Regions:
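Flexible, solvent-exposed loop/hinge segments and secondary-structure transition points
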Residues: 1-142
């Protein structure tokens, strides 16, 4: 099962609300289905340019490799050659820093991923993780 539009929009709303509640810089949030296709995206007023591409890259890498982008960052630190090769295989659409969080259902099946960009990578990840959990789904950051 993949994320539907209604769920994607709910996740986006909750991520943006989380950012506002925590005083984060303006965010861009992208929700992808299990195949890496964009379901929904929102960019807050004032978010800097290219945040869509960064958020999408965080989410795309997560869903493509089956791990949160924090785990991808850790993998890049340990095995840079793997991330370089994976990035090439994914046509450069992999951004291995926190902020790309897998979405799993109650059975543990990957439903898609959420990518957030706009503040620090750690804060981006917080917004994604809390939004996924608030939507009743499981967030996998690592």
């Amino acid at each position: 099962m993949s994320i539907d539009l209604s769920t994607a929009q709910s996740i986006i709303t909750k991520a943006l609300e989380t950012g506002q509640q925590h005083g984060f810089k303006p965010l861009t949030v992208v929700v992808l289905d299990a195949g890496g296709h964009v379901i929904a995206v929102a960019r807050q007023d004032g978010a800097s340019n290219n945040r869509f591409e960064i958020a999408q890259g965080k989410a795309y890498g997560a869903v493509a490799l089956g791990m949160g982008s924090r785990a991808l960052m850790e993998r890049a630190e340990q095995q840079a050659y793997f991330i370089t090769a994976a990035s090439a295989a994914l046509a450069g659409r992999l951004i291995p820093v926190p902020g790309g969080v897998l979405v799993r259902d109650e059975a543990g099946t990957i439903m898609g991923a959420v990518g957030v960009s706009g503040d620090s990578s750690d804060n981006d990840e917080i917004a994604a993780e809390l939004a996924i959990k608030a939507s009743g789904l499981t967030a996998q950051v690592a």
